[in-house]
Amino acid sequence: LITDQPPLPPEAKTVHMYPGQGSQYVGMTADLVQRFTAPAQVWAQADETMIQVLGGETLSGFVLRSSLSKEELKEAEHKLKQTEYTQPAMLTADLAIERTLQAYGHAPDMVAGHSLGEYAALMSSGILDMDGALRAAAARGTEMGSVEIDDKGLMASVTAPYEAVAATLEATEGYVIAANKNSPK
């Protein structure tokens, strides 16, 4: 990595953290795949597994695409929002980034993941192999996508002091809760 910061002291530890579902987008890691071998190999390996799981489809066929028309982009984005695709695609992107870093000597001392990112942490640490993790993530996504609820509710991200949010929630009728209390305010 190129940085203008001083090097870390030898006793410093490095952690690689992996996100959960929600940070995906069409084209994620495409820039890495075009420049480096390691992420291209990860996507190729993922496609070998996912062709079996998705009935002949590949993840890279819609995730790594570029120069799309508006209609093609809309179609790819729609597919990527379906959890049975989202979860293995995010997992593959996480591992593609990880393997790129490792190819250049950047191995973590520790790993952590949020929700789906826990699978990536388990893969990175050697506990899960890629094939098994992808199959588990796809099954998890399929099950999540099959849940039918009459009122799916809504979610909002609010950047405000928690006290103000709590007061608003208390004054609101119906079932409204703060799921995460992680605003910088």
Language model regions located:
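Short, surface-exposed beta-edge/turn micro-motifs
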Residues: 153, 184-185
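Conserved alpha/beta-domain cores
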Residues: 2-4, 177-178
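Gly/Ser-centered flexible loop/linker motifs
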Residues: 165-183
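FabD-like malonyl-/acyl-CoA
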Residues: 4-171
